[in-house]
Curated annotation (Swiss-Prot):
Homotetramer. Its EC number is 2.7.1.40. It comes from Solanum tuberosum. This is Pyruvate kinase, cytosolic isozyme. Pathway: Carbohydrate degradation; glycolysis; pyruvate from D-glyceraldehyde 3-phosphate: step 5/5. Belongs to the pyruvate kinase family. It is found in: Cytoplasm. The lineage of its organism: Eukaryota, Viridiplantae, Streptophyta, Embryophyta, Tracheophyta. It catalyses: pyruvate + ATP = phosphoenolpyruvate + ADP + H(+). Signal peptide: none annotated. GO terms for biological process: glycolytic process. Mg(2+) binds at E242, D266. InterPro entries: Pyr_Knase (IPR001697), Pyrv/PenolPyrv_kinase-like_dom (IPR015813), Pyrv_kinase-like_dom_sf (IPR040442), Pyrv_Knase-like_insert_dom_sf (IPR011037), Pyrv_Knase_AS (IPR018209), Pyrv_Knase_brl (IPR015793), Pyrv_Knase_C (IPR015795), Pyrv_Knase_C_sf (IPR036918). GO terms for cellular component: cytoplasm.
Length: 510
């Protein structure tokens, strides 16, 4: 960190229309699915729209997505679409007359794997068939977001029941979620419902990324790519590690995944609550070193579901995630079902800008270089050199001309102090044409990387490679000036290819 002094705390940041480098993911729901509200969220700073398939039908989500497309068209703001799978869940069963039951501390209760029974104070059911085989006396069962703790006393496989003691007094409703901390659960990462959601809704709708719930090992991602088949190339996989098994296998998951989500909700039931900060820092640090985008999620501005201002702890939590190195911060209930979705995005955006202004980007750059094994790949060497050049020349912007977006993502890995304009260049096929992007996918994929601003440009391309590059670069700089990213007289670092050679150059904005 840098720039920490009393004057820095007292002075306001200049109100020059700056946008945060950190990206904002918003979960869409009842509070945020109309066209006017989606336009407000896009203008406030939403970069990724999350569709949570734990709730809602395909028709419901389709209506929301159609509205989002209209809002994007109206505002001319690009937004990526994320499908978040429900994943393999264990839930408690239905209750007699549908009424919640009262559990008392010290009372014993039987848990059955027969999901057809209607539960009461003596017996409840759970949806996991192998519960009796996987649990042993002394294990813990957490129900309803951890509000109820049951300790296993004995297991009876023939009858399919587990005898438990209740450790606290609480009320249990129907179909509440269940966690089994430390137990290796034999459930597929991709359930039949998930496959249906992805193949029947996600693929036809050209979604950009899938957030996979409860990823436990690297092979889970290999299997999901098999399910996606030919679509695996254009849909990014974002892994959510939500249990101990996933934490233990973190390195192999990171190798296989495209990006990552620190989903602190379920993880907080699986590991002690006082260790969550440690897991968050470890995951973000490793993602940063691997150059893979990471999203920090769950309860970031939770109180804003009902209140127009976040708690001090929440504001600090968002800022600390930025200081840890997260690429994106996420809103869940705040934007999906809260009373102040637009305000939540605006406040989150302001906190991110403030946190970013206190970062020591040069120290981060040096740490990245120190931790990257040699020899670097030619592309990585180029990307890091572009950032070093921008830091030394005090450039105001880095412009990257890229085909698939991977060069721009590598530049983002080295965390320059300035924004990165990622211009996705179409492949030249004819002598001259109006260049516009045939496929926006690479541009939308870059919306989860800190500091990356994708540009979909139009202009005319000349016959030769170097001439066309100059035209594209000129158009990109014009667009950057219009957006307020730089002004005439500023130095800008450009990174692009000419033929088979890669070039880094410093241009002065005209």
């Amino acid at each position: 960190m840098a720039n920490i002094d009393i004057a820095g705390i007292m002075k306001d940041l200049p109100n020059d229309g700056r946008i945060p480098k950190t990206k904002i993911v918003c979960t869409l729901g009842p509070s945020s699915r109309t066209v006017p509200m989606l336009e407000k969220l896009l203008r406030a700073g939403m970069n990724v729209a999350r569709f949570n398939f734990s709730h809602g039908t395909h028709e419901y989500h389709q209506e929301t997505l159609d509205n989002l497309k209209i809002a994007m068209q109206n505002t001319q703001i690009l937004c990526a679409v994320m499908l978040d799978t429900k994943g393999p869940e264990i839930r408690t069963g239905f209750l007699t007359d549908g009424k919640p039951i009262q559990l008392k501390e010290g009372q014993e209760i039987t848990v059955s794997t027969d999901y057809t029974i209607k539960g009461n104070e003596e017996m409840i059911s759970m949806s996991y068939k192998k519960l009796v085989m996987d649990l042993k006396p002394g294990n813990t069962i957490l129900c309803a977001d951890g509000t109820i703790t049951l300790t296993v006393l004995s297991c009876d496989p023939p009858s399919g029941t587990v005898r438990c003691r209740c450790e606290n007094t609480a009320t249990l409703g129907e179909r509440k979620n269940v966690n089994l901390p430390g137990v290796v659960v034999d459930l597929p990462t991709l359930t039949e419902k998930d496959k249906e959601d992805i193949l029947e809704w996600g693929v036809p709708n050209n979604i950009d990324m899938i957030a996979l719930s409860f990823v436990r090992k690297g092979s889970d991602l290999v299997n999901v790519r098999k399910v996606l088949g030919p679509h695996a190339k254009r849909i990014q996989l974002m892994s959510k590690v939500e249990n101990q098994e996933g934490v233990i296998n973190f390195d192999e998951i990171l190798r296989e995944t495209d990006s990552f989500m620190v989903a602190r909700g379920d993880l907080g039931m699986e590991i002690p609550v006082e260790k969550i900060f440690l897991a968050q820092k470890m995951m973000i640090y490793k993602c940063n070193l691997a150059g893979k985008a990471v999203v920090t999620a769950t309860q970031m501005l939770e109180s804003m579901i009902k209140s127009p201002a976040p708690t001090r702890a929440e504001a600090t939590d968002v800022a600390n995630a930025v200081l840890d190195g997260t690429d994106c911060v996420m809103l869940s209930g705040e934007s999906a079902a809260g009373a102040y979705p637009e305000l939540a995005v605006k406040i989150m955006s302001r906190i991110c800008i403030e946190a970013e202004s206190s970062l020591d980007n040069e120290a981060i750059f040096k740490e990245m270089i120190r931790c990257t094994p040699l020899p670097m790949s030619p592309l990585e060497s180029l990307a890091s050199s572009a950032v070093r050049t921008a830091n030394k020349a005090r450039a105001k912007l880095i412009v990257v001309l890229t085909r698939g977006g991977s060069t721009a993502k590598l530049v983002a890995k080295y965390r320059p102090a300035v924004p990165i304009l990622s211009v996705v260049v179409p492949v030249l096929t004819t002598d001259s044409f109006d260049w516009s992007i045939s496929d926006e996918t690479p541009a939308r994929h870059s919306l989860v990387y800190r500091g990356l601003i994708p540009l979909l440009g139009e202009g005319s391309a000349k016959a030769t490679d170097s001439e066309s590059t100059e035209v594209i670069l000129e158009a990109a700089l014009k667009s950057a000036v219009t957006r307020g990213l730089c002004k005439p007289g500023d130095a800008v670092v450009a990174l692009h290819r000419i033929g088979s050679a890669s070039v880094i150059k410093i241009c002065v904005v005209k």
